[in-house]
């Protein structure tokens, strides 16, 4: 699947006239046998790799694609599965890579708006490229069987009764 994903990413960048360089890592291979919090470990390792590559290229920021819905899902997941109340921040100063920042430019953009924009521009995005997602028998190789997907469905169901649910979750940690 790696080559298929890479081709899709390169095609999107070409359509948007964005110069892109793709780097290969062995992070997925490293975490595949981890049983305790593999997703957390993988995310941390990928972020560290991005910081290192950005610095190598003379950059002082990395931009991640987290959007509004990711933020509220993460808040609820932390509460339900981690017994904690915290949020993603739109901008962070790295504690491990001095002088580096992480930004989330889509922080206030709803996922549905991103999907509509992508469809309008005939762009096709990949799902998580991780082996846990690929091999998920209960979700057919998508993220549909994940805790995040469960929380996404819960929020959607609650929004049907109260259209302010998403904004209220977001504002609850401001």
Language-model segment annotations:
Residues 41, 63, 105, 109, ...:
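A short glycine-/small-residue-rich loop at the edge of a beta-strand within enzyme catalytic domains
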């Amino acid at each position: 699947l790696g080559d298929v994903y890479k081709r899709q990413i390169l095609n999107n960048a070409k359509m948007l006239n964005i110069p892109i360089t793709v780097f290969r890592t062995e992070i997925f291979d490293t975490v595949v046998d981890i049983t305790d919090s593999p997703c957390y470990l993988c995310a941390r390792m990928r972020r560290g790799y991005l910081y290192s590559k950005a610095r190598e290229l003379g950059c002082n920021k990395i931009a991640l694609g987290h959007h509004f819905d990711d933020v509220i899902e993460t808040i609820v997941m932390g509460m339900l599965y981690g017994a904690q109340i915290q949020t993603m921040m739109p901008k962070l100063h790295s504690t491990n890579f001095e002088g580096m920042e992480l930004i989330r430019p889509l922080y206030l953009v709803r996922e549905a708006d991103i999907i509509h924009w992508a469809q309008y521009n005939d762009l096709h995005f990949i799902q998580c490229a991780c082996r846990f997602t690929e091999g998920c028998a209960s979700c057919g190789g998508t993220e549909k069987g994940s805790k995040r997907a469960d929380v996404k469905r819960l929020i959607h169901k609650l929004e049907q009764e109260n259209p302010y649910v998403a904004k209220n979750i977001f504002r609850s940690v401001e």
